[in-house]
Amino acid sequence: MSDLLDDLEWRGLVADSTDREALEAHLAQGPVTFYVGFDPTAKSLHIGHLVQLMLVRALQERGHKPLLLVGGATGLIGDPKMTGERHMNDREVVAEWVESIKDQVSKYVDTDGRNAAQIVNNYDWTVKYTALDLLRDVGKHFSVNRMLARDVVARRLESGISYTEFSYVLLQSLDFYELHKRYGCTLQTGAQDQWGNITAGAEFIRKTTGDVVHGLVTPLITKADGTKYGKTESGTVWVDPELTSAYAFHQFFLNAEDSKVIEYLKIFSPRSREEIEDLARKTEEEPWRRAAQHCLADDLTDLVHGVEQRKAAEAAAQAIFGRGELRDLDERTVLSLSDELGAAHHEGGEYPTVVGAMVAAGVVDTKSGGRRAVAEGGAYLNNVKVADPDQRLTDDDFLCGRVALVRRGKKTVGALTR
């Protein structure tokens, strides 16, 4: 296991760690029980969480045992953000999200065998602590000076930070302590913005038990311009297919920038170093083929949505630009297309003409522009060329009875729903 950290670093999964030599020796000694936490701040995990799960998978494949903590307690509080106070969700909502995220994380790890992953909820032990317990047994070991020096707290001091969010570090440190006591957990992993919480937990364990535990954090994934990776114009890219369709998910990764795609492949793809280095050469020599982007999109969509949904997403991408049969697409895929295209909605009454549908869907700006597209042979309804500018849509034109696609030229596509 001596090369484990080297491999994780090559894959870009290590931003920082506690004493590297000590951590490397600890991992080499035998199976290590480690944990990563997921707070239920929404009903679904997103791309950022997948980075953590890739690290979990890599460690588990090397024989280490994962504890996946879903924060039923910490999710009621919220880790402080740079930009302001978090909205506090109702207990019932958080409890529902806990169950949803439990189901999601279990998909990405092995829950059988000697080093089977175990899912835990920090509500189970946190709820047993009284206010006096927390202040006396936990808070006593934390320096307010050091808590104030934390980057996120320092930035929030001027605008204000509640005692609730200020105290979040105590709860996360308590989690590490409880998992160490209950399961022998000696390593906490997380995103780079959790570094302060992780080291605080390690220090708390050292002070209260004398034991040495470890921490390892992954970098925050960004685009070439430095902004957060994992968001589109329509919002966050989720792993829940009800929130982000397989089509939208596949397209998101297919659009990865050339300058970043190899970085993303190393993090998210199970491909070997040799395969990824070969794709790096292809990207440099023939960037227009987008070989690395296709591999990235395929690998991650297979993982999150399954092979069949990935194939459906690819078929949809071909079909909307006239290179496949739209009527072969299933209703789920058709509806995801309309969502991605920002479909206009027909409220009822007589259906519009194709030209009217093109205007409504934003494919052309004006009816005269639509008529011109028809006259030039560049107007399409469900990939069929339109010859008559006064042709009116019918029931049969709505795919799966729901969506009609209009297109101008080769690439400008819109949708109308009913």
Curated annotation (Swiss-Prot):
Domain S4 RNA-binding: 352-410
Single GO MF descriptor: RNA binding
E.C. no: 6.1.1.1
Motif 'HIGH' region per UniProt: ranges: 40-49
Residues that hold ATP according to the record: 231
Described function: Catalyzes the attachment of tyrosine to tRNA(Tyr) in a two-step reaction: tyrosine is first activated by ATP to form Tyr-AMP and then transferred to the acceptor end of tRNA(Tyr).
Protein name from the UniProt record: Tyrosine--tRNA ligase
Biological source species: Cutibacterium acnes (strain DSM 16379 / KPA171202) (Propionibacterium acnes)
Gene coding for it: tyrS
